[in-house]
Structures are given as C-alpha cells and as structure tokens.
Amino acid sequence: MLLASALVFAAMVMPEAQAAVAVDVNASCTLNFQVETTTFDELDNISIPVNIYKVADIDVSGNYTAVDVFDDESLDLSSVSEGNAAEWEARAAAASVLAEGTEPTTTATITGGEAKVSNMNTGLYLVEAQDANSPYYTYSFSPYLISLPDNAYYKVDGATDDWIYNVTVGLKPEQTVRYGSLEIVKNLLVMNTIMGNDATFVFAVNVDEYPCDGTTDYTRYASVTYQELAAGAAETLVNNIPAGSTVTVSEVYTGSGYECLTGEQTQIIVADGEENAPVSVTFENTSDNTWNGGSGIENTFIADENGAFGDVDVTPSQKQN
C-alpha cells in the first residue's frame, strides 16, 4: 500500500539541530489534502472521509510529547530526528492501533480531490483516510503522521529551516478491484418424469471485463441441478466477477428431455454490497417429452491473490418452489 507522500516523512526526520527557528507553539495551522487523480480520475467524483488524531504536542525546539492514548510505549517519539520511511510507517501503524475506539480530534472530507482543515493546533497528527468505493474499485490509504508546523529543509534543495504553518500533503491510493456476483435462475415450467427425478442445466457465462471493449475475455460455466424433481425455480450464484463487467449468459445444455424457451441474456455486474446486487438472469425450460439422455458438469472458478481469473467461484442452490 502506498504511503501518503514521501514529503510527509521528510517533514518529520528533521534533526533538532536544523530547527534554528523556534516553533510558534500557539500558532494556528492549516492542513491541506490533495489526492492524486491523474492516475485514477474517478477519484474526482468520490468523497473520502478523513479522521485526524492529535498524537503529540510540539515544543519550541520541535520535540514531541505524546498525549492521551498515544502516550504508550508502543509509540516511540523520543528520537524523531532518526528513522527512515519504513520506521515512520511503523510509527504510524502503532498510532493507528492506539487510536482504535477513540474520537478523532477533527475530521475532513475530500471532495474533488481536495480538502482543507483550518485553525488546527500545533503538534504531531495521525491522518487516517478511510477506504472509498467507486462502482468498480476500492481505494485504500495507509495511515501516516504529519507535523504541524512542517519544515521544508530536507524536501527542497536550498530551502530554509523555517517552519511552515500552512501544510499541504498528497494522498496516493492503492486501487483494488471490486467483485460482484451473477445469479442464474432456472424456472422449470413442466417436468419430464420420463428421464427420472434429476435434471441438470448448464450455462456459459461470457465475461467482458471492465473497462469493457465489446469482446469476450473469457468464458465460464455454471449449472443448476434439480433433485427430487418438482416444477418451479432453482438458482446458482456465480461469484468473483469484476464489477462493471458485461456478462452474456446462454444455456448450452438444456437438460435431458427439456427445451430452453429463453435466448441469451446480458447483464452488467454490480459490486457486492451495492444496491441491486447481485444481478440476475432467468431461463425457462419445459419438457420436450423425449427420452434424450445426457449429463452436465459444473466448473468452479476462483480468482487468485493477484486478481487474475483462472476461475470463477460458483455457489449452487437447490431452492425449489
């Protein structure tokens, strides 16, 4: 997961010796947030809640003293002039654990990629931008620590060691794909008892992954099986399809002794947890009064840890009416 900005860490590793100018501990500070939207332009249209916790007071020399729940041995602020980015990431993670269950000092909401918090007291702050969802992706942010005031001494060549009370930080998100499901409903109008008490119907699910270009990226198969036959509805759920993908579903095996009355159907996958999820398609079959035999198989497909689709998970249901 990417960190808020390398500049944030540089602001906090400034040795005491460089703080020739005293901190005005009574000054009012401003904290500005900017989200990188060049790579992920849909972030321009997403609101991102941010919780901000005061972790420590700062003295005139730039030293920090932890406050409240953050005054804990798990968070070492005694040597803030030392440590690389990884160590500051660990400090932020420790502060995030200590902040659990506590009320933030203040909050912000990033809209249009920007937010501004004014009239903040000086000190060291933990910033936690919350996960934000678009219809197709989740954007996550690592917690980080920021000093108010900040200092540009190590960030810009030739910069002075003046303290900066109007601070701007950039947020860089990690983007992960959201997944949705497809419900395939089989409505058996008339059962064919000639072929016994079981019937299996197989469906091809052609997936055009988001962003869609009108072509099939891969095809998966799912089945609905009736046991102890009774006319009515049964369904199966195909999981782990990228949200926003277009799926075209067709019945490729109509069951022994049955005919399909429904042509192929198309749906756009909605992310799990959203309104109208999961999307659904319905196929109707009726008996053709023949002795045609046959069988069906169901493949189970599961996405790997990198989001690649070797397979798509299928959850069958035996619900019948």
Where are these regions (language model features)?
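Solvent-exposed loop/turn and edge beta-strand elements of beta-rich ligand-binding domains
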Residues: M1-N321
